[in-house]
């Protein structure tokens, strides 16, 4: 997994907010996003006393988060599961995820890379566990992200959590013919 560093000093546009005049409490709702090596950095200010906010900004109130999950990998749901996954001629990798899941967002770029790398050899699908809860329940998905590999309709392997690309690739390679 790629390492990244977030800068701890606030952007110039926010430094001026540290010098807010006179009032004890200031109500601001500011959110700015900055790109840091493929990740988004969020600076967020809310209703706090000016001393507290200035102190937080001096400490570097910057939070790093992974990008929203939006991919070219086709979606599968409870109603399309059988036709797309169980009846597929080639091996299938299914990424069980949810939009609110931080680790799912972290592993998303890795799954996308692997989908491109294995194009024509293996099919990749994503299943949103919030929108389609029956299928994850049937396969015992209790934690996300969970990645399952199916061969001829049979579950062959399960990988739980945000794991490195090499771990996923090794698991996938076992089922290629």
Curated annotation (Swiss-Prot):
It is found in: Plastid, Chloroplast. Keywords: Chloroplast, Disulfide bond, Electron transport, Plastid, Redox-active center, Transit peptide, Transport. Disulfide bonds join 101-104. The keyword Plastid applies. The active site is at 101 (nucleophile), 104 (nucleophile). Residues 65-177 form the Thioredoxin domain. PROSITE patterns: THIOREDOXIN_1, THIOREDOXIN_2. NCBIfam families: thioredoxin (TIGR01068). This is Thioredoxin M-type, chloroplastic.
